[in-house]
Amino acid sequence: MSRRQRYRFGAAAAVAAAALTAAACSAPGASSSAPAASGTSGGASGSAAAGPIKIAVVDAQSGASSDLGQFEWRGVSLAVNQVNAAGGIGGRKIQLKLYDDQGDPTVGTELARKIAGDGDIAMLGTAESAVTIAMAPILKSEQIPNITSGQSVGLIAVHSPYLFLNGPTGLTYDSTLAKYVVTAKGYKKIAMLTNNDSYGTGEESSMTSALKALGITPVAAKVVPKDQTNMTPELTAIRSADPQVLFIGAEEAQSGLIVKQARALGLTAVIAEGAPAGTPLFLSTAGTANADGTIVSSPYLGNQASSAAQAFAAAYTAAYGSAPELHGAKAYDGAQVMIAALKVCNGCTGLNLANAIRAVKYQGLLGDFAYDGSGVGIFATAIGIITNGVIKPVS
């Protein structure tokens, strides 16, 4: 492993604790600056070559996705505080600025314009595919590279040379999940319940394609609005199809509600899902007993999965007082990819930075990053089973 691929923990964990200052921002365009090790504040300062390297972090700090936004912010802050503690990029410190997208694509569009005006040279986030897709045209026009935590295949359809993913697409999550459910477990009667936003639409498409490749047609397939909280009518219809497996394609809170309501209706099908099922919000919403046995497809199956994951979890916990999960790990990896690119090109910007990101080869928590022309750098997930509230990897 090369020097830029190694994780730097130890004393840097104490520095990372300073990043926990972000508060929820209620107004579109509102932001807060991370206390960079350089001690500078949010505005433009000095020459671009001498001042801090300014990077925007865009994630929900309020609204239904705010928990993901906090995980993302902490993962990014940990990585940046580690590199700043080690001297920064060619002696320049990275300065983060946090923007609250509220999980709203309209707010995201406004923030994309603000980021360009604020002088940020790159963006990390968002966790919401729909928000990232809304921001992408403006970021492309302004030549601002963006490493997103979204996973919808719709991100690829944007065709922006400035847009990169810090994890696999939904197609990878769902292909792995479908193969395990159908081939390894032998289930044939599979129902689907997805929502109608960018993430859910992508999941519906990806899982349908993955099942079709295995000769499976869902016994039931229902779609609900992303803000619907009572899925009883759809689940009742699904129950009548007597499925062996219920695949869910929705964000964390809604997925948890689906599981809770399914069990209340006596629906005993095995639950199968991608990234959302690996989060604390899913588990707390569904209830530990209801979530037990859920099959999860994810590139990050917990903080004990590898020595690197254990070291990351120790540093994260020391800094923030709580354990990380997938989104924190993804954000950390995305920040490390950005840092690696900035080191190689000596703090370059625009298309040069985008090209440097594309050339990065990085051994991350989620796997080995190697970007293709579409902006995807990770192409595999693994299977885990939720047991007593903990994801246990399947050998």
Language-model features: where?
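Sec-dependent bacterial lipoprotein signal peptides
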Residues: 1-23
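Extracellular/periplasmic periplasmic-binding protein-like sensory domains
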Residues: 259-332, 386-393
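Extracellular/periplasmic ligand-binding modules, especially the Venus flytrap/periplasmic-binding
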Residues: 206-208, 255, 304-356
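Bacterial lipoprotein signal-peptidase II cleavage site
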Residues: 22-41
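Extracytoplasmic "Venus flytrap"
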Residues: 42-75, 99-106, 127-130, 193-201, ...
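Extracytoplasmic ligand/sensor domains, especially the bilobed periplasmic-binding protein
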Residues: 110, 117-220, 270-293
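Segments of small-molecule ligand-sensing domains
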Residues: 324-328, 339-391
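Beta-alpha junction/loop-to-helix N-cap segments that form part of ligand/metal-binding clefts
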Residues: 40-41, 67-72, 86-157, 224-228, ...
